[in-house]
């Protein structure tokens, strides 16, 4: 009994507390402030209560719930649509489970933009149980259980078809843009997005992707494209859109919609995107077209697309 109690009083207990409750390391200024409060009489139980009642914990809880739900859907063989999330949240509780649930047991998995990913999402990736999990990013980050590769999406250091599936969660919109907020270079190259998509088509058999969408001019740090514009980019890079779904942040929360509200702009309704496009992309080939035709023949009554000529009218 003495060892657990000693660990609770140990200075390192703050590291464990932040990791378990908030899913991130404690920042130096937080440690300094918290140690001062503990010295002034704050109990560790009171500290735990404060963390659990924080908005940051609520965000982590929503993501953990979403990742756990996606795992259950995946085990049941479901490809969920109509995912929902409450008002006041960003797009993560919708886009992350949408993609994770569609993992199909591939041996080699690539994640694009892992360095700044949500901890709950990284846990979800590790929980896929893929024999080989690789993360690629311009920035460097160490994630236990994931092979880290520092590289440019426009020139990936991988062989053709090396990965069974790639994940790109709210990442592609930043390619070729001003990424100084992430400690990276300032750029403004619209052609970079096409180059990154071509590389992802080259190295992976499937791409599970999410992108914020809406109207308005491009932001310094990201592209702003409407749903059909995104699909045009995907197809121009040599993909076919196997499945897609649009989500919009409404008064009731995040909901699946057949089309976006007119004039919808990034960031006007919540802390992140006002709408997000989730899609499964596959390299354009005769085999994929045949698989798509068979799928539509067998499941023609199920909605598969909300964009393109085969979307329901």
Residue ranges and their predicted role:
Residues 62-106:
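Class I SAM-dependent methyltransferase Rossmann-like catalytic core
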Residues 128, 141-143, 228, 232, ...:
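A C-terminal cap/extension of S-adenosyl-L-methionine-dependent methyltransferases
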Residues 167, 176:
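A conserved beta-strand element that flanks and buttresses the S-adenosyl-L-methionine
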Residues 108-155:
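Class I SAM-dependent methyltransferase SAM/SAH-binding core
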Residues 184-208:
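A short glycine-rich, Lys/Arg-flanked "PGG" loop and its adjoining helix->strand segment in the class I
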Residues 191, 209-233:
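Acceptor-substrate binding/catalytic loop of class I
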Residues 169-172, 210:
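Residues lining the SAM
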Residues 1-62:
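Substrate/cofactor-recognition hotspot
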């Amino acid at each position: 009994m003495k060892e657990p109690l000693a660990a609770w009083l140990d200075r390192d207990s703050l590291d464990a507390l932040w990791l378990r409750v908030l899913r991130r390391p404690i920042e130096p200024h937080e440690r300094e402030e918290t140690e001062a409060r503990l010295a002034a009489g704050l109990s560790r139980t009171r500290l735990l209560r404060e963390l659990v009642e924080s908005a940051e914990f609520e965000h982590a809880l929503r993501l953990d719930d979403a990742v756990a739900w996606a795992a259950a859907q995946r085990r049941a063989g479901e490809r969920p649509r109509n995912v929902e999330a409450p008002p006041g949240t960003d797009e993560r509780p919708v886009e992350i489970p949408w993609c994770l649930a569609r993992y199909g047991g591939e041996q080699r998995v690539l994640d694009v933009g892992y360095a700044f990913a949500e901890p709950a999402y990284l846990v979800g990736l590790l929980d896929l149980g893929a024999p080989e999990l690789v993360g690629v990013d311009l920035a460097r980050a160490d994630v236990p259980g994931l092979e880290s590769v520092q590289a440019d999406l426009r020139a990936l250091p991988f062989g053709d078809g090396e990965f069974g599936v790639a994940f790109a969660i709210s990442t592609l919109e930043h390619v070729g843009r001003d990424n100084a907020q992430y400690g990276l270079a300032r750029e403004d190259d619209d052609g970079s997005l096409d180059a990154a998509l071509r590389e992802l088509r080259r190295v992976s058999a499937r791409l599970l992707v999410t992108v914020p969408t809406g109207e308005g001019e491009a932001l310094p740090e990201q592209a702003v494209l409407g749903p059909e514009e995104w699909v045009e980019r995907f197809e121009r890079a040599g993909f076919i859109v196997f499945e897609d779904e649009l989500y919009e942040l409404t008064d009731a929360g995040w909901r699946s919609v057949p089309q976006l509200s007119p004039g919808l702009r990034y960031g006007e309704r919540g802390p992140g995107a006002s709408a997000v496009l989730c899609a499964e992309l596959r390299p354009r080939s005769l085999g994929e077209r045949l698989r798509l035709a068979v799928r539509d023949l067998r499941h023609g009554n199920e909605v598969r697309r909300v964009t393109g000529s085969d979307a329901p009218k």
